[in-house]
């Protein structure tokens, strides 16, 4: 490129973001690295002192400057507090989506543009391109379906996509580790992060209890309102759960839904977990334009789910109704529904309820 474009690479200390930086340096971009200090304690698996040192070493190896930006207050307000509140209301949130919106593609992008960078880059397995026909930026799945992370990026806007590079999206994980080794990065074989970063042991209930969320016991009920037993608190259960209910119903029963108003949990048969449609709020259309007509597409309601054929109906209030060709199991309020047209992410929203 005739004039080097400046890129601020979001670095976590892991191999994906480090390899992203290496790829961009090789492509001729002028890169610097940045880590967002998010979690308020060292027990977190995110942005720990060890992770920061791994990121700093990778940046140094690549000839990049490295910064740490403290965003703990915003992370607490926009991600952790919301996580607790959503569980308290009987919903099941996805904090990674909130973190991407508010921190990685919110706070970090704002800082980067203020500091004179042209782009930010992350190690997400997804792709961005420009549709020459429409002049709109598009978000696409990562080339490797098993690692694709486009589900957690559906809230990206045209402004953000115009300043975003996703260099690892064209590769699979083994290739990315090879790229890191070729660049001489010490974290090439570092393990992948698991679970929610601020709940490193996976004990969500313990975290919520430490955060002061009351775990108020209540009733398990069936559709006729009959009490089947007592539960230990709404956050202890999730839609589709069968084990650990402690209910002697004479047959297998599953969590169908949680009611935060009267603190009850509805139980029923596996067949009752299936629903043909859902309503979603806080909808984002990546094109920036709400479709005037229903859209034939495919949708997924969980990160690891295979998308299912459906029709998406934009609603006058800005919401979204999704009607599936075949009923879907355990559609969960608080999770995201994300719409796809082939490899292209159309957008999505937060599930309010199934129908």
Can you say where each PLM-predicted feature lies in the sequence?
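ATP-dependent adenylation/nucleotidyltransferase module used to activate substrates
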Residues: 1-154, 165, 174, 255
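AMP-forming adenylation/ATP pyrophosphatase catalytic core
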Residues: 40, 121-355
């Amino acid at each position: 490129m005739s004039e080097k474009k400046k890129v601020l690479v979001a670095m976590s200390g892991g191999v994906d973001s480090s390899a992203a930086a290496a790829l961009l340096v090789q492509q001729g971009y002028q890169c610097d690295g940045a880590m967002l200090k998010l979690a308020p304690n060292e027990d977190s698996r995110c942005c720990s002192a060890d992770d920061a040192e791994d990121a700093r070493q990778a940046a140094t190896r690549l000839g990049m400057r490295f910064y740490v930006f403290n965003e703990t207050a915003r992370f607490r307000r926009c991600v952790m507090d919301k996580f607790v509140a959503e569980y308290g209301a009987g919903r099941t949130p996805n904090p990674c989506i909130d973190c991407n919106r508010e921190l990685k593609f919110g706070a970090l992008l704002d800082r980067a543009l203020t500091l004179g960078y042209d782009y930010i880059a992350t190690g997400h397995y997804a792709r961005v391109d420009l549709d020459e026909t429409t002049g709109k930026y598009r978000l696409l799945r990562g080339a490797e379906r098993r690692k694709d992370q486009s589900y957690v990026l559906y809230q990206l806007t045209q402004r953000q996509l115009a300043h975003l590079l996703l260099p690892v999206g064209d590769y699979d994980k083994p290739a990315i580790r090879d790229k890191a080794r070729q660049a001489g990065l010490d974290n090439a074989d570092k393990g992948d992060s698991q679970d929610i970063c601020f709940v490193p042991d996976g004990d969500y209930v313990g975290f919520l209890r430490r955060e002061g969320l009351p775990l108020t016991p209540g009733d398990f009920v069936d559709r006729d309102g009959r009490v089947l037993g007592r539960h230990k608190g709404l956050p202890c259960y999730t839609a589709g759960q069968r084990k650990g209910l402690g209910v002697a119903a004479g047959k297998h029963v599953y969590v169908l839904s949680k009611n935060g108003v009267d603190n009850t949990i509805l139980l029923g048969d596996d067949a009752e977990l299936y629903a043909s449609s859902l309503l979603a709020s806080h909808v984002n259309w990546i094109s920036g334009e709400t479709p005037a007509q229903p859209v034939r597409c495919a949708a997924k309601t969980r990160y690891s789910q295979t998308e299912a054929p459906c029709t998406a109906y934009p609603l006058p209030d800005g919401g979204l109704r999704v009607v599936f060709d075949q009923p879907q199991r355990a559609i969960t309020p608080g999770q995201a529904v994300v719409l796809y047209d082939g490899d292209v992410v159309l957008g999505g929203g937060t599930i309010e309820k199934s129908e």
